[in-house]
Amino acid sequence: MVKDWHANTVRFNLSQGALQYEYAHGLSAYADMVRNVIEQARSAGLIVILSMQAERYSCTPYEDGGLQKLPDLRTEQAWKQLLDSRLTHDKGVMLEVFNEPATTRACDDGTFRHPDWKSWAHGCGREPDQGMLTVGRWLRKQAPENVLVFMGDGVDFGFSGFTVPHGMPSNSAYSVHPYQYVVRGNLIDSIHAWNTRFGNLAASGHAVIATEWDEGLKHCPNDPNQTITRYFIQRYLPSHTIGITVYGWDAPVHAPGYIVNSYNYPGNAATYQFVDPNSDGCVHDAGRILQETFRADAVQ
């Protein structure tokens, strides 16, 4: 990762379910393993982003037949299980409060394009200690030195219509997942969407990170020459000082590291290539564009 991609940051999705189970039963095997992996990454010189994940990929049980889509007391218990003095005194470890919150699913509030930011911050009373700001403020007390990362809501888990709420912890950043970065196959429309979802927030002086991104299936036919993709990676993000991590990087097999997305495939075998498999035979390689950009940045 460091040698072939010139990466300086790695993001790990944590299993809220596993950590919470250990918290409730006095166990530590999973938390110990995670700490060991973090130590290896830090020894390699990488900044580490830890993201609390409560989706099915993280072995976290459903609540009321559905996914947990806002952090709550269970999220706090999971963080408490993992955090120790080494992590909370390491400023090279960033804590992403909760992965991909959705108030429409957690609270039946707002819409996908117009999130309810009050519920995002404070929850809707359905669970104890619910809400991104609620849990974020609790997490700040546990980890006063780490950067806290707050993910948005709605399209691209962005920040359309967002106003920073009162009481947001200091030393915080904001994260997005801009998978829907190509809009109607048009660069001007795409730039407008980027501005609305995260660019304006970055331009106002707030730190923004795209903590997941890949080219995805839907964008191959809509960006035939990868004009939008190149502009997004090579010009827009740098001009707004927005960092990016890909989803997801895997270790080398027959070549120096790939972007893979294998959770939709049966068995344990990932399809190793630079972008998601595409039934239309698209040969785009946005991963290579990103890799080249990382290399160029490293030279500078």
What do these predicted ranges mean?
Residues 70-94, 98-251, 256-296:
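Extracellular glycoside hydrolase catalytic/binding regions
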Residues 1-9, 24, 153, 288-299:
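N-terminal carbohydrate-binding accessory modules
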Residues 1-9, 13-14, 20-97, 127-138:
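An active-site-proximal structural segment forming one wall of the substrate-binding cleft
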Residues 16, 55-56, 215, 251:
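Conserved beta-strand edge residues that scaffold enzyme active sites
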